[in-house]
C-alpha cells in the first residue's frame, strides 16, 4: 500500500518475521520506501509517524544486539534531499503470530487525516 502524506510519498513495502530482539523476543521487520516532497533535506523520523499494531495493540520498537538481515539501523534518521527516494527499516516486538497492521501518518497531524495503512500476515 502506498500514498501521499503532507510532505512525503510513502510505500509500505513489507513486514516479515525477523531476528529476536535483545530480550530474545520475536520481531517483525517493516520496510518503508519514501520520497521527500519538501523543499529541504529531511528524514523519515522528522516527517512520518509509523506505528505497527497486533490485535489492536501498538507494538514496541525492537532493539537488536545483532542487526538482522536487511535491517539498517541508521535509515530512520538518514536525511534525503528534496525529491529523493530512500528506504527505511524498523523492527517491532511481536506479541504473537497474528497479522500486523502498519500505519503511517504525518508526524505532527494528530487528526490522522492522511494515513497509509496495510495488513500483513506474519
Q: Where do the protein language model's features map onto the residues?
A:
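Low-complexity, acidic Ser/Thr/Pro/Gly-rich terminal tails and inter-domain linkers that flank the onset
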Residues: 1-25
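Beta-strand signatures of extracellular beta-sandwich domains
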Residues: 11, 51-53, 101-103
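Short structured motifs
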Residues: 13-18, 71-76, 87-88
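The feature marks short-to-medium sequence segments in extracytoplasmic or secretory-pathway proteins
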Residues: 23, 35-84
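Hydrophobic core residues within well-ordered beta-strands of beta-rich domains
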Residues: 28-30, 86
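Short, surface-exposed ligand- or partner-binding patches at beta-edge/loop junctions that are enriched
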Residues: 87-118
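Short, solvent-exposed mixed-charge patches
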Residues: 121-122
